[in-house]
């Protein structure tokens, strides 16, 4: 295998994830390797979740989260669920604490194999999201796409869930909007110095919503867990929905759903949903060269 490490191709509601086992190594998955893997039809991904040895006492691992353009991401809820499922299959453990670029994540796998991830507390301060302009009320900011007198999208709620999010409210199915056209413009808007994830959210009842997301550094994606968290929090914050909602991810296979709860007692956001193992292989973290396992692998494990 040479310089190769084990990896598993997984998905969270269709969000394509490569879970890479970098434990016992001092190097990391390089940007050029990520770009090469993203450019291959079989290994194309939305995020790489690279599992490293822990840097902090009391944590199981440090997780590097890498976008398909080679940049680092602070959070990936769907990817975290995949990591938990893989490590649970390997170790038999059900509860994990991880360190990421954004901080500490706690997660647990349930008996039905769904995974709950404590995504931490949302950040609403404009300079910590961050925004390039001062807004005292980030539940509704001045930003729109389209004519001034008839904007297609306008007045998003903005926040950070470890990464910047803008949630635009829409009155029909999010799939009916041309997010492929608007997404890149909004992701790279000067208002977002670190770029932003762009989500269209339709509130369908006090406890249900539908979303679609253009993901920072990944583009149009089938699902984005942190975006679902941002949408759920924003809906509760603006009085559109309760603090506990089921969010249908419109672009996911069979329109799958995530349960999002913005806990009142501590302000943390809990995301619960499924993850799915697809296949396993080995890859070179420097170049992105890879090979698929010839024999049937052990499901959902990367070791």
Curated annotation (Swiss-Prot):
Biological processes per GO annotation: lysine biosynthetic process via diaminopimelate
Recorded catalytic activity of this chain's protein: (2S,6S)-2,6-diaminopimelate = meso-2,6-diaminopimelate
Active site: 76, 224
Keyword Zinc part of the UniProt annotation: no
Main location as per UniProt: cytoplasm
Annotated residues for binding of substrate: 15, 47, 67, 77-78, 163, 197, 215-216, 225-226
SUPFAM superfamilies reported for this sequence: Diaminopimelate epimerase-like
Keyword Translocase: no
Pathway listed: Amino-acid biosynthesis; L-lysine biosynthesis via DAP pathway; DL-2,6-diaminopimelate from LL-2,6-diaminopimelate: step 1/1
Site (Could be important to modulate the pK values of the two catalytic cysteine residues): 165, 215
EC number(s) from the headed UniProt entry: 5.1.1.7
Keywords associated with the record: Amino-acid biosynthesis, Cytoplasm, Isomerase, Lysine biosynthesis
Listed Gene3D superfamilies: Diaminopimelate Epimerase, Chain A, domain 1 (3.10.310.10)
Role summary: Catalyzes the stereoinversion of LL-2,6-diaminopimelate (L,L-DAP) to meso-diaminopimelate (meso-DAP), a precursor of L-lysine and an essential component of the bacterial peptidoglycan.
Oligomeric form and interacting partners: Homodimer.
Family membership noted in the UniProt record: Belongs to the diaminopimelate epimerase family.
Protein name in the entry: Diaminopimelate epimerase
């Amino acid at each position: 295998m040479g310089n190769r490490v084990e990896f598993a191709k997984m998905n969270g509601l269709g969000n394509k994830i490569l879970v890479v086992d970098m434990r016992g190594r001092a190097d990391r998955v390089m940007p050029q390797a990520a770009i090469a893997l993203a450019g291959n039809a079989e290994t194309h991904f939305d995020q790489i979740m690279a599992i490293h040895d822990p840097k902090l006492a009391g944590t199981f691992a440090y997780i590097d989260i890498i976008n398909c353009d080679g940049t680092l991401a602070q959070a990936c809820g769907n990817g975290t669920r995949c990591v938990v499922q893989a490590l649970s299959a390997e170790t038999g453990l059900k509860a994990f604490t991880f360190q990421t670029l954004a901080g500490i994540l706690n997660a647990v796998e349930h008996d039905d194999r769904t995974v709950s991830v404590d995504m931490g507390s949302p950040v609403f301060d404009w300079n910590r999201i961050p925004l390039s302009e001062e807004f005292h009320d980030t539940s509704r900011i001045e930003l729109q796409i389209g004519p001034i007198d008839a904007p297609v999208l306008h007045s998003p709620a903005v926040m950070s869930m470890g990464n910047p999010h803008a949630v635009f409210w829409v009155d029909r199915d999010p799939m009916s909007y041309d997010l492929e056209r608007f997404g890149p413009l909004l992701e790279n808007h000067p208002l977002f110095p670190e770029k932003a994830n762009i989500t269209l959210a339709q509130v369908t009842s006090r406890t249900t919503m539908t979303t679609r997301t253009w993901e920072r550094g990944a583009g149009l994606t089938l699902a984005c867990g942190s975006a679902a968290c941002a949408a759920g929090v924003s809906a509760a914050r603006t009085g559109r929905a309760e603090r506990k909602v089921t969010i249908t991810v419109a672009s996911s296979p069979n329109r799958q759903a995530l349960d999002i709860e913005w806990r009142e007692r501590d302000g943390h956001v809990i995301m619960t949903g499924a993850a799915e193992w697809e296949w396993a292989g080995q890859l070179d973290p420097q170049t992105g060269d890879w090979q698929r396992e010839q024999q049937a692998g052990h499901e959902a494990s990367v070791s």
